Amino acid sequence: MSIRSPFVVVMGHVDVGKTLLLDKIRGTSVAYREPGMITQHIGVSFVPWQAVERFAGPLVDKLRLRGKIWIPGFLFIDTPGHAAFSNLRRRGGSVADLAILVVDITSGLEEQGVESLKLIQSRGVPFIIAANKLDRIYGWKSVENRPFLFAVEQQEWHAIATLEEAIGKLIDQLSRFGIEADRYDRVRDFSKQVPIVPTSAVTGEGIADLLLVLAGVSQRFIPREKLSVSYGPAKGVVMEVKEERGLGVVADVILYDGVLKKGDVIITAGIDGPKETKVRMLIMPKPLDEMRDPEDRYMAVEEVKAAAGVRIVADGLDGVVAGAPIFAVWDLQDIQKVVQLVREEISEIKIETDREGVIARADTFGTLESMVLFLRQQGVPIRRADVGPPTHKDVVEAVLSRRKNPTYGVILAFNVKIPPEVEREAMSSGIKIIRGEILYRIFDEYIKWSQEVKTKTIEQILSQMTKPGKIQILPGYVFRRSNPAIVGIKVLAGTIKPGVTLVKDGKEVGRIMQIQKSGKPINEAVVGDEVAISIHGDIIVGRQIREGDVLYVYVPDEQIRQWLFQYRQYLRDDELKALEEYLKLRKR
């Protein structure tokens, strides 16, 4: 077995310099390579350790790392961001071995940075933080490609003070997520603290430090067996499926183990389940030294060994979804076994149950897995989760789910378009569709919407329930003795409304027909109000009820239980007092 280079993903908020940082790292690799040393990949940039040593020589010596690094180098995923990270999935973990979370040192951790951080944590991937835009620290004196440890020694005190303040703010932000972090040269225990490396993607300062810290973290925290590559059928993950002129539909794949050969049978997965096909062509970029014509950048190869990024040309790749596993089969007797393996793997991501919960949709297996994981962590139950745009069935399932809980009548759509006919059907069925490209925004919108639904639902329930109330007939304010009786009253506790039934000593005396205040009808009267009420019932004031009598609002038994055990918080103190007194009277 040989040792492969670890896969590294760069993540972070928009405009923090992820792409520029990647470009700087790639440029470093090209500039300091030995002739013929750089192997080109599809979707991946290889940075050999020898190039890092050449670039960061003085810092390598200062940190005493020369001769101690056994990894061949790094394989940087060319596309930064959480979508690429999500698609680098494998059963039980991630194909990504390391992550760099890029943060703008001048503004700290931002929204998508938080999303990236939680995604990294959910997959258990070791990571370091690049505190980028070091060149924007007020008063900072930049020198191109200088290591940070050497640069900081040459700065004025006010620039260092500004830097320390920015790093301190970032450390505080990270602590809110349970992460202990510090500037990398101050970290005492890398198993407990996350290193922060100040960098500038513009000047190249700190890039050397970043690569050396990455090497140290990789050797310390990535199990050697995870980086061991066997000579056997290839194992990989689909990163992108697209149509290429002259080739048809192709799949860009990351191989993390084994060997893939032209003519191999491969098993992967689409929306409808496992797919079997045969490799017609394997395409790799030409070596840099041979790349003369920009239009002639690629070449066909007979085989590719992991770890690598390769483009596969094969029949039947349309419908294959990014994030799907891909396995080569050398012994044809193993095909059904591998098909079952793929089926089991995607069934762990896709969800179809009769339980209560929301409907989840995402564009790839990777993003769906991240979405499901995140929703479960937030305590949101899922009834159905699948890859691709929402369908008629999703709307039907959402309607069924809503019957059990109104907040589950929703489709959460991550990175997918909504077909117009599905949108119309959802609207007519009263099903909410929340679509977005940032998972946390979808979740936040769902929480906001579900709270509105809960509030509206509770308001509807409460509007149909009878609130407790206690009144006293005011002496000298009998305006009519019967048919209906009209009297002046004071609300001693609770609330009264037209339509409620009044009781005296546990016996019903009549129903309030109307409430008037200052000669005008009102919808309700609350504690402290003095109003006139008309009472419909077989009563005469002076017989069944008298001046000075205390009457209570009749509350049905089921509603009493609801008020006490479900909606107690919606009762005012005086309403609760009226209910408790009413219960005591009933027990006499």
From Swiss-Prot:
Which residues hold GTP? 12-19, 78-82, 132-135
Question: Which Pfam families does the record associate with it?
Answer: GTP_EFTU, GTP_EFTU_D4, IF-2
Which cellular components does GO assign to this protein? cytoplasm
Query: Has the keyword Nucleotide-binding been applied to this entry?
Result: yes
Q: Which residues form the tr-type G domain?
A: 3-224
Q: Which CDD domains match?
A: aeIF5B_II, IF2_aeIF5B_IV, IF2_eIF5B
Q: Which SUPFAM superfamilies is this protein grouped with?
A: Initiation factor IF2/eIF5b, domain 3, P-loop containing nucleoside triphosphate hydrolases, Translation proteins
**Stretches the record annotates as G2:** 37-41
Region listing for G3, in residue ranges: 78-81
What's the superkingdom here? Answer: Archaea
Please report which protein family the annotation says this sequence is part of.
Answer: Belongs to the TRAFAC class translation factor GTPase superfamily. Classic translation factor GTPase family. IF-2 subfamily.
Classification via PANTHER family: EUKARYOTIC TRANSLATION INITIATION FACTOR 5B, TRANSLATION INITIATION FACTOR IF-2-RELATED
Q: NCBIfam families annotated for this entry?
A: aIF-2, PRK04004.1, small_GTP
Q: What does this protein do?
A: Function in general translation initiation by promoting the binding of the formylmethionine-tRNA to ribosomes. Seems to function along with eIF-2.
| Name of this protein | Probable translation initiation factor IF-2
